[in-house]
Amino acid sequence: MALLAASENLIYFPQRLDPAGRQGILARYPGVVEVSITATDGVGLHGWHVRGGTGPMRPLAIYFGGNAEEVSWMLAFAEVFAGWDLALVNYRGYGLSAGKPSQQALLRDALAIYDHFVGQPGIDPARVITVGRSLGSGVATYLASQRSMHGVLLVAPFDSITEVAQNLYPFLPVRLILGDLYNSAALAPAMTAPLRMIVASHDEVIPVQRSQHLFDAWGGPKERVTIAGAGHNDLQQHREYWQAIRNFLRR
């Protein structure tokens, strides 16, 4: 168990947000609401709520980032989600969220984040989607397995972190060391929510077969968009990436 815990720690690269950064965000985005959520174990999670929807009942997109991602960067692209509320909450240990990340904690926190936002006045529970990028694809897939979703948008996803690591280090007993980490493929066959998967044509982190395995296993309606010329960490620099997100939101 100690080896497993130590190995899992290698997955996370928490990025913090200092007080000056927080003040800068509040000044730059005056319409953004700061959010504090208490996890089931008492850990405080911090994030942002962009109210982009209109009307008495608003659709909601809940975003989960990568393993080295402080999610406030997404505020600069909130207009992509025009017509939708956008929930950006940092993993524990990231941004201004307290605690230490682990698979068990992040999956449990995803449920708390969903329940918090869906419980807010004016949020339409029938029109909630989850968006997961890289590590966040595992969190988003788990959330979609536990809560009703209008749709699931996965960016540079994997079938299982353990399988990705085994591809990268075929000479090591990765499955023995890591155990079963973020096994989205095991959850995929039971999914009924529509999936849009966005992948990079030159992803140097997630082998193409790992994304394809998840796509093939998905039980609900699905479509796959490949961003030509993109790598794992520069998808956001391609106009086609943001257009693929907009198109999914408008369906």
Positions of predicted regions on the chain:
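An N-terminal hydrophobic leader/cap segment in hydrolases
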Residues: 1-36
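Membrane-embedded segments
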Residues: 40-116
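Short alpha-helix in the alpha/beta-hydrolase fold that links the catalytic acid
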Residues: 77, 184, 193, 207-216
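Alpha/beta-hydrolase fold nucleophile elbow
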Residues: 123-134
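Active-site nucleophile loop of the alpha/beta-hydrolase fold
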Residues: 149, 153-163, 180-184, 230
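Short beta-strand/loop motif that positions the catalytic acidic residue
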Residues: 190-192, 197-203
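Acidic catalytic loop of the alpha/beta-hydrolase fold
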Residues: 202-206, 232-233
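Catalytic histidine-centered segment of alpha/beta-hydrolase-like enzymes
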Residues: 230-240
